[in-house]
């Protein structure tokens, strides 16, 4: 934040609290993965922490809602996730979305993002 000029834009993106809490409740292994998510951020506290560093909060939005269910399945079947039918099927569904971008899946993703979005992005302006 020290190199950003006043009026500059800053984006912070973190795992969204609700979907991440579900993952942590379903699997201790998930939360202990090397390089994994180290903590769960609360939206209001993260905004306040960044504002305290000299930024103005502009907006936030959530993304990747259809990924939440995939991670919940992986956490639920952690030990057998590589061979589990549901995890495998849902992974194919996500690959379809990523590679082909069917409009109906985009619609579902956008519809569910406000509640189930796996990631949340925060937009700020430097004072």
Labelled PLM ranges:
Residues 13-14, 63:
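Alpha/beta-hydrolase-fold catalytic nucleophile elbow
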């Amino acid at each position: 934040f020290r190199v950003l000029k006043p009026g500059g834009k800053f984006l912070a993106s973190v795992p969204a609290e609700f979907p991440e809490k579900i993952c942590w409740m379903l699997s201790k292994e998930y939360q202990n993965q090397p390089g994994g998510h180290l903590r769960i951020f609360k939206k209001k506290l993260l905004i306040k922490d960044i504002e305290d560093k000299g930024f103005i909060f502009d907006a936030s939005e959530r993304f990747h809602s259809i990924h939440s269910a995939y991670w919940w399945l992986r956490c639920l079947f952690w030990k057998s996730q590589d061979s589990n039918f549901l995890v495998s099927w849902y992974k194919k569904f996500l690959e379809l979305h990523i590679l082909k971008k069917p409009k109906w899946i985009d619609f579902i993703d956008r519809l569910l993002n406000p509640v189930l979005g796996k990631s949340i992005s925060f937009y700020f302006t430097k004072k």
